[in-house]
Amino acid sequence: MSLRDIAEKTKPKSKRRGRKLSSNESRRIRAYGHRAERDLVKKLRAKGFKAVRVPVSAPSSEPLPDVFATKGGCILAFEVKSTRSDRIYFKQEQVKKLVEFLSMFEVYDKKKAVLAGKFPYKWVFKVADKIDNYIITDNEESSELVNS
């Protein structure tokens, strides 16, 4: 038995649901998300926030948001998703990473984990009050971010 045999047998094959994307399709989808993140940073800066996009090329075990912003005694951590559909799903693990990221910043009085959904003609923001799965639809109204 060789090391290759051991390596091949340790990981069971996962059953992928749906169709496999080509590299061009995958790149286009990621670029659509990156544009939404950059757009959000511009919007936050226009409202007086100090905002930055955290460019992470692959899913990470580190608790990093897509975008974070500060203003006064408040820090916001955003998970950003964009779609051409009418709903966006946020997994519990993504919300947990936002909460873990915010817990590192003890100096801020207000800390908010915010789920941001960019639809074709509208942004929707939802404050994640607890670690759970969330769905944002395009007919929802945004949560109040800083004053709540």
Report the location of each language-model feature.
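Acidic-basic catalytic patches of nuclease active cores, encompassing PD-(D/E)XK
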Residues: 1-56
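Conserved catalytic cores of phosphodiester-cleaving nucleases, focusing on short active-site segments
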Residues: 44, 67-84
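Short active-site-proximal "capping" loops at secondary-structure junctions
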Residues: 57-61, 83-84
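Short acidic/glycine-enriched loop/turn segments that link adjacent beta-strands
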Residues: 60-63, 121-122
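Short connector loops at helix/strand junctions that flank enzyme active sites
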Residues: 62-64, 73-77, 108-110
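A short beta-strand motif that forms the metal-chelation/ATP-contact edge
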Residues: 66-69, 125-127
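Short, charged, amphipathic alpha-helix that recurs within catalytic cores of restriction-modification
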Residues: 83-115
